[in-house]
């Protein structure tokens, strides 16, 4: 059965609310609950809709592939089969919707990247934050990213626009580690021609690769994110 989640977007975006795990559960129990939630999410046909019924994201039932299968098919995920590759060392699941215009980052490069995203708290079964609303269109989240021999480090920029939704909501410049996983495989550029599009991915990020609130409260999130190089 298709699972439909309706969302009411407020003027300043949507916040699902920070959750507390101070309920007597051990860390091991919280991790088990997280694993169960991810497993259930993979097998549900989730559709996230706006309050007016317009479809925002159709996640669908997910087919996972191994890293070996992912690399064997030129680091792509088959969209018709709704494939997500699971990275065993981090537990992050990734679907590359579009590899995007431009080129992959190179060693020593620094880039300022605009990110537009929706964050879905899998454990709470609700959208927690998004900057895909009218208010945040002119104030997107901006990452300052450095590539050092294939290892990416990043922080949210606050000097350009005072910080986007992620920074304003969580109060931290730290970029979730899960957000950096796609940078090895996607291009970072800008749309120049009509037939070009910027990079877009979908992620399932466990608490260990998430922001500080996810880490401290042990919950996984689903993300849909676009990555676009900012003009100098």
Regions found by a protein language model. Name each.
Residues 21-232:
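Cross-family detector of peptidyl-prolyl cis-trans isomerase
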